[in-house]
């Protein structure tokens, strides 16, 4: 099978656990995930099978969406409920109005210091390993962007919210920082990813359900094709002759395309090359120019998804 399965991850599983389960259920070795979710988190975890693994570097997962619940008054070393309590503070002064006001301060571009309990590495060692040894090392702030932050429900000391943010945002740290601004501390109780780029919870499936579909011969119905996963790229549709060229790693000529959109290509812009709705290659524009400058395209990756070119 070749495609992406959008796994609705259950709590307690690591991202590696999910990949191992998909590999076992599908009975194939070529499997990889596009990002990670904390073990306590649930929701969208895209997993690539077969030729879809080649598409991972070209995905646009710049926008993520999460639904979360934080608890005010308690700060932990992991910034979630699994960690050691660092301090407890009174939260009785917090009002819904104050919550909304503080949350508005976090919308926009921000510098966020990654947590010690993260997979980021320092001198080749994951930070979480250093943290488990009791070490605290300086971390460089990273620029992130919060596109929206909405308080969904307030049942103090618990607060439910939805956040849409850039890739690389730590929602645990966001909750911790909101708690700091409120003067009482906070940590995450729940984290559920509902969106990761083109992959939505609306198209997600649990591993148990997918295993049942595999037994029924319907597992392929749930897969997102590499072509669909790269829908953010301009699409150049090949003729059968052009498709055969691309399959052999040859850059097609102008006459090898069925449809060419009137469009400008930027330097290093990536485009799809397809035939019959199947992704055959991702190519890169070597020079800026209009769509007729196809001689400047270079094949970045060829996909072996279809060889029935007519």
From Swiss-Prot:
Positions annotated as active site in the UniProt record: 38
GO:BP terms for this protein?
A: tRNA pseudouridine synthesis
InterPro entries associated with the record = PsdUridine_synth_cat_dom_sf, PsdUridine_synth_N, tRNA_psdUridine_synth_TruB, TruB_C
A Pfam family in this protein? Answer: TruB_C_2
- In the UniProt record, the signal sequence range is none
Give GO terms: molecular function aspect only. RNA binding; tRNA pseudouridine(55) synthase activity
EC numbers = 5.4.99.25
Q: Which keywords does the record carry?
A: Isomerase, tRNA processing
Catalysed reaction, written as an equation: uridine(55) in tRNA = pseudouridine(55) in tRNA
Q: Does the keyword Transcription apply?
A: no
The family classification in the record reads: Belongs to the pseudouridine synthase TruB family. Type 1 subfamily.
Family matches, as NCBIfam families? TruB (TIGR00431)
Role, per record: Responsible for synthesis of pseudouridine from uracil-55 in the psi GC loop of transfer RNAs.
Protein's UniProt name: tRNA pseudouridine synthase B
Give the species. Answer: Geotalea uraniireducens (strain Rf4) (Geobacter uraniireducens)
